[in-house]
Amino acid sequence: MIPAGNTPAPVSIKVAGCASLLVMMAVAWGGATTRPAEAAVLGGMGLLWLLAPARRMPQRGFVLCGCGLVILAATAWLPAAWFPAEPWRRALQDAGLEPPATLSPQPWLSAEAFVWLLAGLGWMAWLLGQEWDSRMRRAAMRMLVGGTVAIAATALVAWKLHFPVPGWFPDHGFGPFPNRNHSGHVFALGGVLALGCAADAARSGWRKTLPWAAGAALLLVALVINYSRGGLLLFFGGTFIGCALEGWRRRSWKVLTVGASLVLVLVALVLLYGGAVAGRFAGGADSQVGFRVLIWRDTLSLQHALPWCGAGLGNFRALFPLYRSASVNQQVVLHPESDWLWLATELGWLGVILALDAVVAVLRGAFPLTAGSHRRLRAAALAAAIAALLHSTFDVPEHRLGSALMALFVMVLARADAASPAESRGAVVVSRLCGVAALALAAIFWTMPDDAARAETLSQARRYADAEAAANRALAHAPLDWRVYFTRAGERACRGLTLEALADFRRARKLEPFYAGLPLAEGRFWVQSQPALAVKAWGEAIRRVRAPEDEAIYGAILGAAPDNAGFREQLLGLAQGRPPLQLQWFQFVPPAEARAHLEIISAVASQCAPAQRESFQRRASEIGSAPAAP
């Protein structure tokens, strides 16, 4: 170990390359959204911290804010009795769910999220603890850009040739992440950095800029195909911020005006030739801007009902359905569409303040953008970092490991060259201890089974006893996961444990009070063995949906019903007060049953749409009892 007081050499190209490759591995491995990928990334961090430890302590402001976040997150394990009674606890108790004595209703899930909070802070501290000079910064930035361009090119080829990339599970068929907004976040950051590399290379001649400009163009094409407004806004916003920083540095309105004009030209080209992307910006059917605002309203209602320190890490998804009001529909909400609101829900507004202070402490080192400090590269990184922070206000890119690691890395690359302080022996020791801990936790995560998924697999294989045991283990880890209760209820129903199954179905419905697919599937469990319970569950499914969504649900119910006239009569009762559903029933049942209810259906047909009335007339004619047109 180097004695304290000696000046360390700048971080080597190998360390910078390994850090960049780790980020790219996280992105390329499906955004590090699966347990093996998360474990591998955590193990990679551990190796870096152990073999290339931080040589100095980070800035005091970052350390204080980071410690504050850790202490605040640890309040999740304080006794719940120390805080005011929360309404959701009483609601869960009424449903037969007894929350634990801790503030967090899911302490083990909070512990897992706590590990990732420590990992994120440790990653940033390790980056800040290295001595980045201009040469290393340029190398790291070029590696990030090159890796991002390679991933985007792979995504474009896979999209064009219609072949799946192993480890990628995009919900819209493009990009490494399941969520297109997270893929767009990474592509946009890479695009802004590519423009910075082009500007830096321009000092050696315009030909040197061509590879980086081509990379930025390819990333822009990927953003258009990715169909993410957030990614495009991040790219154009980051580019504009970079122009604004250069104009501010030169005190030149001309630079700002020219830069803004170029950005507007790019925006116009995307809107003109970007296909359906313009429709999303114009508020088309796929835009969902209004729905996002409704989610924010309900998230604020949830946050208002929580203690000052939040509900504990990892609990938003479980508690949000209990506070849905403005955003009620058939979409299951997984996150609050804002990193900062998510943080406020789980760590309170104090957590938001501490996180913002930590970001300010890091980005303060980016100023001033003086000549001779590779200001073009740093200005691009600073612009990308600011744009990423703005993006996180209306999306959740920093709650995905792959996109978060890249954003944190970009923040550090924006900082000026360090003044080469003396090496801290304490920083080296702490870094290596954290590396050992990270490797141990990575091994645990790698071997940790996904009991919830295993329970479903075992249930499909009709190994119901083993499936219930796996579900019990999953509920010990996440006791408010309605999906696991539903899985266990189905297993118990198949084993003839009716009362136990009913209790689990009730718990699942309480934890997810709006999704109609839940009671719809419950009815399918009961329809053969307990038809009365199926009718009751399906009645709940109909109650949860409004027109016209109820027609699809009711059609599924009719399709799953047994061939029994008395049962179909009960299903007609579920459609009471919903004329379109009554007509749907009339179209579905055999002629004799339809004829018996012709008078009732005819009376409500006038309340339906013209196409439905015409369909009713045709059906009535087919069964030989056509009434006068209503």
Each PLM stretch: what is its role?
Residues P53-Q59, T75-A91, E98-T102, R135, ...:
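Transmembrane alpha-helix boundary signature
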Residues T257-L272, E423-D450:
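Internal/C-terminal transmembrane anchor helices
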Residues N179, V293-V333, W340-L343, L347-L354:
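TM-adjacent membrane-interface loops and short helices in multi-pass inner/ER membrane proteins
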Residues I2-A32, P36-L51, G66-A73, W108-G275, ...:
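Alpha-helical transmembrane segments of multi-pass inner-membrane proteins
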Residues Q93-P107, P164-P176, G290-L294, P321, ...:
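Juxtamembrane membrane-water interface segments that cap and precede transmembrane helices
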Residues A453-P630:
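C-terminal luminal/periplasmic domains and tails of membrane-associated envelope-modifying transferases
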Residues H172-P176, F235-T239, L266-H304, P321-L322, ...:
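Flexible juxtamembrane loops connecting transmembrane helices in multi-pass membrane enzymes
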